[in-house]
């Protein structure tokens, strides 16, 4: 687990922020190298599925020419929601590292841990990595909306 990967995800969250999106960024790492990046694009694409994790998983699948990401790690600035957790399970991602906990929709710890259910795959999960930095950009974004 490397902070440099979470730092890169945080830079992508800032890109999302600048685009008027909920500031969440993600990277997928294989063999110590970033192979895919993504950030929230729901407003830009007008697509409810365009969360950072989904964007990133789609790109990683294209790069590897496979839907199986079992040797990959996902770094994301916010705890994944139910949809993204399902995509993580289905794509067999080995490890998930997230920053801020999501008390409203977090599905790896905060609200529910979908990975505790007897699905066919269970990733390793590490939460609260660079939590303050990841939480801060979200707080600023939502304060501006009010």
Predicted segment positions?
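Short beta->alpha transition motifs characteristic of CBS
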Residues: 35-42, 122
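Helix-adjacent hinge/juxtasegments
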Residues: 46-50, 54, 58-87
């Amino acid at each position: 687990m490397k902070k440099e990967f979470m730092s890169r995800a945080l830079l992508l969250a800032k890109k999302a922020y600048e685009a008027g999106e909920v500031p969440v960024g993600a990277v997928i790492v294989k063999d110590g190298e970033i192979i895919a990046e993504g950030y929230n694009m729901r407003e830009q694409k007008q697509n409810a599925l365009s969360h950072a994790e989904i964007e990133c998983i789609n790109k990683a699948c294209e790069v590897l020419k496979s839907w199986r990401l079992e040797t990959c790690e996902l770094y994301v600035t916010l705890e994944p929601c139910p949809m993204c957790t399902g995509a993580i399970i289905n794509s067999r991602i080995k490890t998930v590292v997230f920053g801020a906990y999501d008390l409203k929709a977090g599905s790896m710890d905060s609200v529910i841990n979908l990975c505790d259910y007897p699905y066919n795959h269970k990733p390793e999960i590490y939460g609260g990595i660079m939590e303050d930095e990841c939480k801060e950009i979200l707080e600023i974004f939502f304060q501006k909306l009010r």
